[in-house]
Amino acid sequence: QGIAWKSGWRIFGRPILQKHRGSHIEAGPGLVLRSWPRSNPLSPTHPVVLSTRNADAELTIGADCGFTGAVVVAGERVSIGNRVQVGGNAQIVDTDFHPLTPEGRAADFNAGATRPITIEDDVFIGMNALILKGVTLGESCVVGAGSVVSRDVPPRTIVAGNPAQVVRELREGE
C-alpha cells in the first residue's frame, strides 16, 4: 500500500511523496533526497516531489540515486536506473496532465496523454532540465542544465538546449 522503503536512504528536508491509491512507488537502497536548501549549494527552490497520478501508475528508482529539489511525476510509468543523479529543480513528467484541446479539458481536465519514461543507469540530469513523456535517456548520458528533452537520448552522449540536441559523445574514461 505504501512506498517500498530500502536501506541507506538519506533525506534532507521534507520531500513530498504523493502516491495515488493502487499505484506503485519503489526506490532502491542508497536513495538521497535533498529538499533543504542548506543540503546543496545549488539550493533547491522546492522540495523533492515523487508522485503517481492514477491507480495504474508506476514509479521505480534504482539503487544509489540522488535528487535535489526535483519533481518526478508518473501518470503511466517512470523507470529510473541505478546511480542516476538529478540536479536541482529538474522535472521528469510522463504526462501532459490535461488534454491539449479546450474540448478535451472540458470533458475531463485530468485526462492528459501519457507515455512512459525510461532513464537508464548512470545518467546525469542537470539542474532545471525538463524530461518529457515518452523519452528514453540512454546509459551514461548527460542532460545539460535547463535542457528540454522531448526525444530519446543515445547512450554516452551529452545533450543540451531547448529542444535538447546532441552536443557530443562521451569519450572513453569520461
Protein language model regions, located:
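Domain-scale signature associated with acetyltransferase and cell-envelope carbohydrate enzymes
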Residues: 1-93, 114, 120-122, 129-131, ...
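Short glycine/proline- and charge-enriched loop/turn segments
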Residues: 100-110, 174
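Histidine-centered beta-alpha loop that forms part of the nucleotide-sugar donor binding/catalytic region
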Residues: 97
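Short hydrophobic beta-strand segments in globular cytosolic domains
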Residues: 126, 132, 144, 149-150, ...
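C-terminal/domain-terminus segments
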Residues: 136-160
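Active-site-proximal flexible loops/turns
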Residues: 101, 105, 128, 168
